[in-house]
Amino acid sequence: MLKLLLPMIMLLPTSWLCKKNHLSYTTLLFSFTIALLSLQWLKPPFELTTTFSNTYMGVDPISTPLLILTSWMTPLMILVSKNHLIQEPLSRKRTFTTTIISLQISLTLAFSALEMMLFFTMFEATLIPTLIIITRWGNQMERLSAGTYFLFYTLIGSLPLLIALTSLHTNYNTLSLFILQLNPPNLTNSWAHTMWWFALLMAFMIKMPLYGLHLWLPKAHVEAPIAGSMILAGVLLKLGGYGIIRVTLMLNPLTKSLSYPFMTLSLWGIIMTGLICLRQTDLKSLIAYSSVGLMGLVISAALLQTPLSITGAIILMIAHGLSSSMLFCLANTNYERTHNRTLLLTHSMQTLLPLMTIWWLLASLMNMALPPTINLMGELTIIASLFSWANITIILTGLGTLISALYSLHMFSTTQWGGTPPHHMHTITPSHTREHLIMMLHMVPLILLMMKPQLMTTF
């Protein structure tokens, strides 16, 4: 663990000490090296033990895929922000790189934490760099409103979580995940224990986000720069799912009786957000709402607590992290040229950027879970486990899958086809090799994981 954590920490002084002309290349090279080194965490499917670094940190089959995803996204964020920062002075470029690296360190510590208070601290620490990225480097004035939404939604859920953890430590004298899973708290259906259950899970529900608590997400995505959208869609939403999977293991038998409203709301949210996506005019907002629907599937799978559902949740989180991040990158390539996110004003891109159409097609097919993608593996696994829990869920999940196919095809056809391009788009610059490299680095892991999905399974 430390042989990867220390190089991450050393990237902070490196970004301030390296020469002006070498800043982007140095940080990019080192972060790619860390991303490749993180692959050593992968283990054969029959070796499902926890690797301890110390009593507070460790790596197991649930956290490993998310840790590797975090390490993989950092160099992509640095690479995709190159054009966004081209007009910025050197000190701001260094500050931006430092913010991204500190976010990577916080996420790595959160995913590898085996002690609840360390996990809570790092869970909250990710808020500060993300808020700085949204409010300082966002494109519109509304970024301040988006930052306020993001801050207050997250903090409202975090205070009950802190109180619940303090209460847990007072009663059991430990916050170690392993001890609490082996010797779980003796919970009853009393009001106190019910409120404690809600307090422990509410912060993660908001982070996912659960339908009804999701209003901060479209605002944050739309106003954030491309690096902010990538880390939000790619990793930060998964922090909520990871927290639910970890915490629910010690909340039995209350979860079986109290999870019904949340599972119903998350499954209903798949249909509602899908219908919202069909009526969206803003491209980034469409991708953000599609994330809410897919994360609803993950919430219901995590609360179901069967080995099959948790495996499906992890597969879908990894698949969504890469595919939605790729969609945001593609939306950014259009925005950098047209300075517009409206679907009707940026149509017929195929005639202007023909190579980008291939990436748009692949990303849309991944997002709609076409066979044999890992998105389909994750969705099918979750749908099967939900069907075995309650047969009626097949109506909601089936409708949700149909609507997601509709809005994915609508997004692709609107952006790529539609007659003659508008006049304001006739003189846009062609696509760069850097942009194709970014898309390839998103797509290659998705294709390779199709060949060996056992790397993400937990049983």
Swiss-Prot record:
One GO cellular component, as annotated: mitochondrial membrane
Bilayer disposition of the protein: Multi-pass membrane protein
UniProt cross-references to InterPro entries, sorted A to Z: NADH4_N, NADH_Q_OxRdtase_chainM/4, NADH_UbQ_OxRdtase, ND/Mrp_TM
Catalytic activity: a ubiquinone + NADH + 5 H(+)(in) = a ubiquinol + NAD(+) + 4 H(+)(out)
EC assignment: 7.1.1.2
GO MF entry, a single one: ubiquinone binding
Record's subcellular location: Mitochondrion membrane
Enzyme class: translocase
Superkingdom of source: Eukaryota
Nucleotide-binding is among the record's keywords: no
UniProt family annotation: Belongs to the complex I subunit 4 family.
Function text: Core subunit of the mitochondrial membrane respiratory chain NADH dehydrogenase (Complex I) that is believed to belong to the minimal assembly required for catalysis. Complex I functions in the transfer of electrons from NADH to the respiratory chain. The immediate electron acceptor for the enzyme is believed to be ubiquinone.
Protein name: NADH-ubiquinone oxidoreductase chain 4
